[in-house]
Amino acid sequence: DPNKDSKYWSGFITNEELLVDKNFFKLLEKNGIIWGFVSGAESASAKFVLEKRLGLKSPPLISMGDAPDKPDPEGFIKLSKKLLGDKFGSSNIPIGYIGDTIADINTVINARKEIPSQKFISIGIAPPHLHLKSRLKERNSYEKKLQDAGADLILNSINELINVNLDLF
């Protein structure tokens, strides 16, 4: 119940496998990569995962209710403006979006339609439960669906992002 104090929360939100850890964000910052979150979860749930489980301090976040649901790009564009200012266009840095659903990939495709001069890159990754060795076949199938939906890149691990040159896309 998102209306309860999160110290009383239990279940999946408290023990779901996460794709990242706090060190990942420190590494992004060290490499000059600006980051934020667009979440389909309610604000309280998203903040619980980001702040309590990952230990991030007031991370940039657009959550359910802050913008229309994905694949509408409004939340993604709103967060990008918040992080970069209103500097969209071919002279701006590429903006990457990592997601684990087809709606995430379609959000990027729709952002390109809204601001065609800006380079938006869709990066797909399978959700945490498919990263188990026993689910490799399902994961491969899921990643193919992300690619077929239009993902520019599929990551096997979120940590691979550090080695990706987004200017190549």
Residue ranges of each PLM-predicted region?
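Short loop/turn segments at strand-loop or loop-helix junctions that form parts
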Residues: 1, 124-128, 159
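Short amphipathic alpha-helix with an adjacent loop that forms part of the alpha/beta core around
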Residues: 84, 161-169
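Short, acidic loop-to-helix structural element flanking the phosphoryl-transfer center
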Residues: 1-37, 44-47
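Short acidic-hydrophobic, aromatic-tinged amphipathic segments that line or gate anion-handling sites
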Residues: 152-161
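Acidic, Mg2+-coordinating phosphoryl-transfer loop and its flanking beta/alpha structural elements
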Residues: 97-153
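Substrate-recognition "cap/lid" segment bordering the active-site pocket of phosphatases
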Residues: 9, 14, 36-96, 102-116, ...
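Structural signal for conserved beta-strand scaffold positions within catalytic alpha/beta enzyme cores
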Residues: 62-63, 124, 156
